[in-house]
Regions:
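Short, compact, well-ordered microdomains
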Residues: 81-128
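Eukaryotic low-complexity, non-globular regulatory regions
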Residues: 1-3
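Compact soluble domain cores
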Residues: 11-86
């Protein structure tokens, strides 16, 4: 999990670090939960991932749920919103986008779960 180093931060930087940590925790919970409806968010796969077949898609979903290997390269803001993994010899990415409750635009306050809906997309790098 993330850790905030507060030794040399302005109050604004500290607030931003707290916001990002909240988003990271919410993204982790979202990745690991089983959605009963779309009140929290949606999972989608690209056409190219879907074309690999149901076993491949299922393997991707399981791997995303278990994923913990976040790197600064793939997740530079520490929000745990993007990762890279290998599935059956293929590089697969996932990313989490944060929308308003109507899925029409970005959330005004991504750290507030009542104002944010998540969309997790599983994709190949070539889909990006």
């Amino acid at each position: 999990m993330t850790s905030i180093k507060i030794d040399k931060m302005t109050v604004e930087q500290f607030g931003e670090a707290l916001r990002r940590e909240a988003i990271a925790k919410q993204n982790d919970a979202f990745r690991k939960m089983i959605l009963l409806d779309e009140s929290v968010g949606r999972w989608v796969v690209t056409r190219a991932v879907y074309a690999e077949g149901p076993a491949f898609v299922a393997a991707c979903i399981l791997a995303v749920r278990k994923f913990e290997d976040f790197t600064e390269e793939m997740d530079p803001y520490g929000e745990r919103s993007m990762g890279r993994l290998e599935i059956e010899g293929e590089t697969v990415w996932f990313k989490i986008d944060l929308y308003d409750v109507d899925y029409e635009g970005g959330s005004d306050d991504p750290s507030e779960v009542t104002k944010t809906r998540r969309v997790l997309t599983i994709l190949f790098p070539s889909d990006y």
